[in-house]
């Protein structure tokens, strides 16, 4: 087995286990150690080509409760922390005014 094949197999394992990193805006902080972040997906319509926006809301674990409503945050996928929480807060990119 060549060295290149071994390196390719290692690269595939790393990509498979990579965590999703997203950014969005905080819309709610009413729960303890949990924030609700709104994420925006942009997709092009298959037939007409128009760029369409779709928003989704996810619950995010905020251990130190540092984020506030309106803040732009970066979140990272993690193991399931509860029924709905699968993300954790990585950093606050921009504070709300």
UniProtKB/Swiss-Prot annotation:
The keyword Signal does not apply. InterPro entries: NA-bd_OB-fold, Ribosomal_uS17, Ribosomal_uS17_bact/chlr, Ribosomal_uS17_CS. One of its GO terms (molecular function) is rRNA binding. GO terms for biological process: translation. GO terms for cellular component: cytosolic small ribosomal subunit. Keywords: Ribonucleoprotein, Ribosomal protein, RNA-binding, rRNA-binding. Residues 1-20 are annotated as: Disordered. Belongs to the universal ribosomal protein uS17 family. One of the primary rRNA binding proteins, it binds specifically to the 5'-end of 16S ribosomal RNA. Part of the 30S ribosomal subunit. This is Small ribosomal subunit protein uS17. It comes from Corynebacterium jeikeium (strain K411).
